[in-house]
Amino acid sequence: MKRARMRTSAGRKDVRTAKTETAHVAEEVRARLRENEAIAHLEIDVESVSKGRAVFFMEVQSKHKQMHGVVHGGILASLADTTAAIAAYSTVPAGTHIATVELKINYLEPVPGGRIRAEARVLRTGRNFVVTECEIYNESGEMAAKALLTFGATAGHSLERA
């Protein structure tokens, strides 16, 4: 297991697992996502969050499926967007707002059901943009979709139009 080293107030090294630290961050993110009605409706949940990375999951339900009995592509895109956004937020200064400016997704396998998992990582954080990728896996562990996302980043003010 990966370990994070931290200095105590006495200057000695204190070893804590990265898993414990990310569990705390994941719980904070989970609470914020519950406030978002769209995410709450989709029932997207957090597995882990660390700097530049996020892993989310979703249990497929009938409301996620299109008429052919597989998960709708827009649902997979929403899962990728949400997961990648949290990974992006983890790399920008506090008070920075981000918004998706581009999302490209390739659907590789149909997803008929089960638990799907999204893994996002930041490829580059610049002054105005954050570029990420997100892979979505079906219950069997096969990659079902791959997305490349770019987020615009603005420090200190809201992205809402006046």
Predicted feature locations:
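Terminal targeting signals and extreme-terminal segments of soluble enzymes
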Residues: M1-A162
